[in-house]
Curated annotation (Swiss-Prot):
It is found in: Cytoplasm. Transmembrane segments: none annotated. Specifically methylates the cytosine at position 967 (m5C967) of 16S rRNA. Its main location: cytoplasm. One of its GO terms (molecular function) is RNA binding. GO terms for biological process: regulation of DNA-templated transcription; rRNA base methylation. This is Ribosomal RNA small subunit methyltransferase B. The lineage of its organism: Bacteria, Pseudomonadati, Pseudomonadota, Gammaproteobacteria, Enterobacterales. It comes from the Bacteria. Keywords: Cytoplasm, Methyltransferase, RNA-binding, rRNA processing, S-adenosyl-L-methionine, Transferase.
Amino acid sequence: MKKMTNLRCIAAQTIEKVVEQGQSLSNVLPAAQKSVGDKDAALLQELCYGVLRTLPQLEWVIGRLMSRPMTGKQRAVHFLIMVGLYQLMFTRIPAHAALAETVEGAVALKRPQLKGLINGVLRQFQRQQDELMQQMNDGDQQYLHPKWLLERLKRAWPAQWKQIVDANNQRPPMWLRVNRQHHSRDAWLTLLEESGKQAFAHPQHGDALRLESPCAVGQLPGFDQGWITVQDVSAQGCVALLAPRDGEQILDLCAAPGGKTTHILEAAPQAKVMAVDVDAQRLARVSENLQRLTMQAEVKQGDGRTPAAWCGDTQFDRILLDAPCSATGVIRRHPDIKWLRRDRDIAELAALQQQILDAVWPHLKPGGTLLYATCSVLPEENHVQIGQFLQRHADATLIETGDLTQPGIQVFPQADGGDGFYYAKLVKQ
């Protein structure tokens, strides 16, 4: 059945849910995509991701074109104008089509009386486009990050903050992990090339391939059979550092959606793995991934701060703690993070990470390894967190594998490389 709803209206409503209501894009977008049908789902995704990526510039332009912002019940129209501006500024959609469809979105929003206003604002932009596009690259809005985060990055990484911000504003590459139980990386790459696609092997990570162009997983040879998993190369680095072995008791804590759980079992098929996450909905995806790769693990819902509740007095040979964090290293994949996070969240997240680390440490066997990981680039969650942990726990030793000036390894997001990530490998004496 043909869907009749205005796509620009749906994009505006989806963006409003993220920016005004604090919902995550990955939670609200799938339902929105179902309402427009397969053909338009990709365009809806492009508009939502694009507006959230470039929000400060769009806000700045609206501020130049309108004397006062739209508030209250008119707020959705504000986001509809943003959708219109994004199309005119950053896409190849013909201007006449972008304009007509966006103006018509006012009817779908039950604000037909504002069609003239929307049309006027977008046409005014067209008249001043060159001048506005030049001016919007002068102030802080050019960096496309909230002020608080920009200040934290400048303070933490005075030499690298621009590189981090630039990478955050790019479209992310699509990384794959080849399941070595089925194929070597080179053998699967041959299958991919036979299907007409290209990928590039990572020089350090033996299972990792970067697709030349992202595609739907259904187009990847053997995806449903578990030959391949979509996982960023930085996340793949966790299991290489954890170094699991057959026969070991291994805990994957904060395991959802299961990419690292399955990677552990690819590396050590005879390991006894327990995968734990606090979020029941996301935990279901761990089970789905295990099923797709025909692997076995004990999957449990549980809070990392109270391990005795879900593992009793069990001690593990290895623990992978992919801690809850600000996700500031994966902004390019989830641009809504910039608008969902607040400055005060960082201290709260650091406190939560500390509680989980301290709670789970007694469940590591003497001689065992705990790998602490985050997808953050903020020191409070990373080397500062681990520095404080080492001061509290005399029986913990950090295995130095990176820059010796600070504990652990900090990776920044890179255009053709991995996401921003942090790792610290701790051994119990």
